[in-house]
Design a protein with these regions (language model features):
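Positively charged n-region of N-terminal signal peptides that target proteins for export
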Residues: 1-4
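Expand to "…catalyze enediolate/carbanion chemistry for C-C bond making/breaking, isomerization
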Residues: 17-261
Length: 261
């Protein structure tokens, strides 16, 4: 599973006071978000526009929007979606890009810079394979001169999110969680299950192990949820809950009640 992902890869369009997620976490509150819905017909390549983003911005249930460009990176979509959200809301925009293993370090570094230049709050880099790749990924945020929010930098205005979806990375979760300049660390439970040969129980165990490390060092941890399990996920301690599709609003309403919001 991909993080469609607790505090985390979000894009912020101004200072920290304008970043809704970063308003909530210091208060110990859970943030709720939604995958940016494609405006294309079902089965067609995704389409994201400023008009579509403006419509999403009208929904008061969402604290953040997760723009998933892992499958096909589109800088035009980043800019358009950011503009649409910014016009009428303070919602945080999180953009997920393809993994380093797909397009290489230089391309990934350039994308992080491009996304922040477009005004986004944060970037999510998925499929971090090990500790060394996690260190490499965080240098991209340094190169972009992003003022990254972290427990050590509570006045930061940008979010750096990494996703662990492979067994080796899960095994190195403690060391990765302790890296400087990290905002959100999440486990891609679906992808991890695939890497484990379909072992859903093993993937859930990995998810809980990553969660425990984020709670230990006070990072954000994001996870998708449904109406059936959102209350449990909040009790477990996830602080960024992601919904998708027509059932997202129902899930968030249940989650907000459970979280005291």
């Amino acid at each position: 599973m991909k993080v469609f992902l607790a505090p985390v890869l979000l894009f912020v369009f101004a200072s920290v006071v304008d970043a809704q997620v970063l308003d909530l976490w210091p208060q110990g509150k859970v943030a709720f978000g939604v995958y940016a819905p494609s405006e294309a017909p079902r089965g067609s390549p995704p389409v994201y526009t400023s008009e579509g983003a403006a419509k999403v911005a009208e929904n008061p249930l969402y604290d953040f929007v997760f723009l998933n460009l892992e499958g096909a990176y589109d800088p035009v979509a980043v800019k358009a979606y950011g503009q649409g959200l910014k016009k009428s809301s303070r919602k945080t925009l999180i953009v997920r890009i393809p993994p380093i293993s797909k397009d290489g370090p230089e391309t990934t570094r350039a994308r992080v810079q491009e996304i922040f230049d477009a005004g986004a709050d944060g970037v999510t880099i998925p499929h971090i394979r090990d500790l060394e790749e996690a260190k490499l990924a965080l240098t991209f945020f340094e190169a972009a001169k992003a003022n990254v929010w972290s427990p050590a930098n509570p006045k930061g205005t940008k979010l750096a999110m990494l996703m662990l979806e492979d067994p080796k990375a899960i095994a190195q979760r403690r060391e990765i969680a302790e890296l400087k300049g990290l905002s959100i660390l999440a486990c891609g439970i679906g992808s991890l299950a695939q890497a484990l040969g379909g072992d859903r129980a093993g993937a859930e165990a990995g998810t809980q192990q990553v969660l425990a490390e984020t709670k230990r060092v006070k990072l954000g941890n994001m996870l998708p949820a449904s109406a059936n399990d959102v209350e449990q996920r909040i009790k477990e301690g996830f602080n960024a809950i992601l919904g998708q599709g027509p059932q997202a609003d129902e899930m968030i309403k249940i989650g907000r009640t459970a979280a005291g919001r």
